[in-house]
Amino acid sequence: MLADDKLRARRELPAAYRPADSATIRARVGGQIDVGVHSATHRSLPTLTDEELEREVVTSRAMLHRAVGIWPEFFAYPYGHWDPRVRAFVLSAGYRAGLTLDAGLNDAPDDLWCLRRVNISAAISDAAFQAWAVGLQGWRRD
C-alpha cells in the first residue's frame, strides 16, 4: 500500500521535479551535465562491511555505466562520511576524485579522493551568486 502511495505521489509531481530516467540522463551526458556516483543506497559508508562497501562504491558505478553508457569519474560520499578505508575503495574503483562535505576550497596538492566543497544554497539570488563567483565574498582556509 505504501508503495502504491509513493508511485501515485511521484506521478502527480510536475515533470520538472521527477527523478530523471536513464534515457533523459543519456541524452544530457557530455554536453550539459557530468554524472557521478553517490552510492547505491545512500548509507554511511564507514559503517559498512567490505562486501557492502563494494556494492555501494564499485557495483553502483557499473550499474550506472550500464544504464547511461558512461563510466562516472567522480564519487560523492553520502552524508560526507568517509574514512581511509572508504577512500581506498573509491580510489581502487577507478574514480578520478571523491567529494566530501568538508567545507572549503582545494589546492593542486590536495588529495583528490577527499576534496572539500563549497555549498551554494538554492535560495541564493543571482546577484549574490555572481558576487560570490567573482570573489567578492572572501573564503578562508583554516
Question: Which residue ranges define each predicted feature?
Answer:
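Active-site beta->alpha N-cap acidic-glycine motif
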Residues: 1-32
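C-terminal active-site subregion of NodB/CE4 polysaccharide deacetylases
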Residues: 30, 40-43, 47-142
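Non-cysteine beta-strand/loop elements that form the S-adenosyl-L-methionine
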Residues: 35-37
